[in-house]
């Protein structure tokens, strides 16, 4: 995927077979291109990850944790570039983009620290499929990938096709941090195609997924159809998040918090506010 990534903010012709990535705030602005993986390429990514597993899983957990900390250093070094990508490709605000990069750094350092303390005798599973969403294209992508890697697994990472350039750049930074070839394999393609080809592959030993409840249930069914030993699935899907407001709350602050929680990322967040409970004493002030 890295070989076919072309970063550009100019209006140039789309390369043959590539898909243009546009700024969601200005769809006439092309910020880059990517190619979708076909079935044969998807199968090859699993093969590459499987081949890299014996050496990577035998690497000392302290060394794997050290590489995560080096990746965190790379993220901080390239913070401004990653901010720009989050804004241009994912349509995030500056504030949200800053929080996104910080969260990605925190994930790397957190899993590095926890692994060093708790995974000395743990046994890795094998190849893990990580499927991440567009609304947190750096933080959730790296949260999944870093957790799987530091435990000694190799990874096939499937970012949302809408925000794949961020994932490609992250892989470049992983390479700069010293991660070996093939321990992380990137697949860029529509989710259904990836699900049909990779999820049923018996070489996949675990799946991490963040997205819709419907898709999470579909993945669970596909894994169950494989039979044999159950395949671990970590699925983070939608939720019904509520806010309870009593008479001690400042109405103007409540309104501001409700709007930001419910409508940032167009409401497309697992943590977005869905239900508001108001004490009668303050209900009229807040609603009107």
Regions found by a protein language model. Give the residues of each.
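ALDH superfamily catalytic-core signature
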Residues: 176-178, 206, 214-288
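A structured beta-alpha segment of the ubiquitous adenosine-cofactor-binding alpha/beta core
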Residues: 185-208
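Structural signal for hydrophobic
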Residues: 128, 152, 184, 204-207, ...
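Terminal low-complexity tails and localization/encapsulation signals of metabolic enzymes
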Residues: 1-47, 51, 58-74, 84, ...
